[in-house]
Amino acid sequence: RLPADSISLRTDTRVRLHHGSGHWPARIVLMEGKSLGPGEKQLAQLRLEKPACIWVGDRIVIRNWPETVTLAGGRVLDAHAKNKNLRTAAQKIFLKQRAEHHTDASKWIDSQINRDGVGKRDGVLKPSHFYPTEIQMTVDDMIASKELVQVGQWIVKVDIWNNLRTQCASEINKAHQEHPERIGLVLEQLRPLVGSVFGQQNLFEELIADLE
């Protein structure tokens, strides 16, 4: 958010990002529009010129390049964002959900699984400003409430996993009906279907185990 007594901040402005006792040069890229007016707030990406150790959820301060004026304050919503994905619909939904619920671990976990389709149980929201015990308890609660399901080392949205199981079971039944003389469907034929849902994440073995 830009303070009410500030001047407008234009996209691609070179600034200094302050976090704790450190500061780093960066360029600020606004997600929408070319400038941010006084008192306004907006999602933006900071493209750092040097690596920085900042966790997801941490508060930051943005100062002008000469470091004479504080321009804005903010919170890190995605520490590993890719430039090419900045304005995609999935990334916008992901960032807005986190911005609107910055202290709710369940919303942050949900935002990641919604965007990526899957997450590692022991890696979700790590590192971040949420305590590890809080993250694990939140995941447990989301599994207990049938929002998520754990398959092997992964956590997945229950409806997505169930839909995938149903599709795979349908393909197996179809193969039995069309070719009753065969033992069954070659399970490797299901791999592309799993890949279409989870992309590069390999949950094929977990799915086969769940179908047995």
Question: Residue ranges of each PLM-predicted region?
Answer:
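C-terminal effector modules of nucleic-acid-centric enzymes and ribosome-associated factors
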Residues: 1-212
